[in-house]
Amino acid sequence: MKYIFVTGGVMSGLGKGITAASIGRLLKNRGYQVTAVKIDPYLNIDAGTMNPAQHGEVFVLHDGGEVDLDLGNYERFLDIELNSSHNITTGKVYRMVIDKERRGDYLGQTVQIIPHITDQIKDCIRSAAEEKVFDGKPADICIVEVGGTVGDIESMPFLEAVRQMRSELATADRALVHVTLMPSDSMGDLKTKPTQHSIKALRELGIFTDIIVGRSERPLNSHTKKKLSSLCDIPQNGIISAATAPDIYQVPMELEKEGMADVLCQLLQLRKDGADPEWYRIVTREYTHRITIGIVSKYGKEDVYLSIKEALRHAGRKLSTEVSIRWLDAERVEPADLRECDGVLIPGGFGVRGIEGKINAIRLCREERIPLLGLCLGFQLSVVEFARNVLGIADACSSECGDGTAVITILPEQEGVENLGGTMRLGDCPVEIKSGTIAYKLYRQHEIIERHRHRYEVDPAYISRLEDAGLIFSGRNGNRMEIAEIEDHPFFFATQFHPEFRSRPTSPSPPFLGFVEACLKNRGKGE
């Protein structure tokens, strides 16, 4: 097993995750099996209970792990399915160590950060790296991204563990990539001083960098690379320019041009086979159409809906269609806003805020035949809207958000659950598809697997009444409703699951493909 450690300096939010994912893609393009581990130095066990407006999207893995959005990027770039073990948090590590101490595993030792915490971190990294995620076989290379910034107190135990692993591994089995900011001064010149200080801080911890990735608004010139090489004692071919790209999926190609893959192959003594051009063909496909999709959201931060944005782009690229997203505040959205869109998407969420705005948006799309895709909460509210305005239950609601007639109720297994973290219906669940439906047309099979994250479901007592009134439940898990659709509508489709989490640039999600195609047809009618 070979390891590539990715650290960050100067400031957070530089794109370490995209850099790590892009490195993985470069090596995958050369025929290697690549996995990835994300270290998040916070005390939370996982991302499941975090405020999305602060933390961003909670990405759901196939085994139900609620993790940082960077793991979504890993899955999309590398075309793999990761497990909960691939996200290591301070909370997880401390809980493991404390559990061992309580069991007496340490045989009376004084439990300390070094060696007990650092040993546990190394065990977690190795265990995740050796997961057999490739048809029963482990990966050839593991990329380990250390969250946070060099110098943060929270990251210190993890950086010490990286230092130890670097010493324990053979030279050809490890490489360290440091992502750092290259700011411009008032004259537009790129400044190297912050990077020099960041490299110095790493060296003071006993960690020596092999490659520097300079994040900047414009490419690094040869003079800047030569200066960094001299001052940071790194060969000039190890100074990689990473200017801001218009499309994140083009970052691997930009790093390829900079020689990143060749340098890593040299460091890790890997064969330098030619790169598979499939990725290039997919991400450079030209657009011949353009559509606007409105997302009726309650959170102002776009990162909350990252996987939805990417799934729309995957479908759009497959159909040579550029997707422009219009963000519509669920508490302020007006009918005119919706009518200006070629289609409307109602995403998942929690709580009562913005609920009525979303329901009103669903009604307008149903009545005015605007393509609509509802996800999770969007599925539940589609049922509520139908119950109110077609079935005639004026006070229909979800028991999560109202005191009326609850056509959406809590899952039986969720009753009495006290802890919020890790207790929802999470991860992969099978869904049976009904023949002759939109769902079957999209998936072309009778049973599918999709990822879930919810506590509420359609009340079984109302299913037959809803179906008699024209709502088709085309996907089920036993007596649990999973997909709802309407006949004689351009595209009215809602899922209890989250299809966006399984979408890839190489294989777009079927519901998103169908939705974008319907939006494209809807736009064509108005032209």
UniProtKB/Swiss-Prot annotation:
Keywords: ATP-binding, Glutamine amidotransferase, Ligase, Magnesium, Metal-binding, Nucleotide-binding, Pyrimidine biosynthesis. Catalyzes the ATP-dependent amination of UTP to CTP with either L-glutamine or ammonia as the source of nitrogen. Regulates intracellular CTP levels through interactions with the four ribonucleotide triphosphates. CTP binds at residues 12, 152-154, 191-196, 227. It catalyses: UTP + L-glutamine + ATP + H2O = CTP + L-glutamate + ADP + phosphate + 2 H(+); L-glutamine + H2O = L-glutamate + NH4(+); UTP + NH4(+) + ATP = CTP + ADP + phosphate + 2 H(+). UTP binds at residues 12, 191-196, 227. Belongs to the CTP synthase family. It comes from Methanospirillum hungatei JF-1 (strain ATCC 27890 / DSM 864 / NBRC 100397 / JF-1). It comes from the Archaea. ATP binds at residues 13-18, 70. Mg(2+) binds at residues 70, 145. The active site is at 376 (nucleophile), 498, 500. This is CTP synthase. L-glutamine binds at residues 349, 377-380, 400, 455. PANTHER family: CTP SYNTHASE, CTP SYNTHASE-RELATED. CTPSs have evolved a hybrid strategy for distinguishing between UTP and CTP. The overlapping regions of the product feedback inhibitory and substrate sites recognize a common feature in both compounds, the triphosphate moiety. To differentiate isosteric substrate and product pyrimidine rings, an additional pocket far from the expected kinase/ligase catalytic site, specifically recognizes the cytosine and ribose portions of the product inhibitor. Residues 1-270 are annotated as: Amidoligase domain.
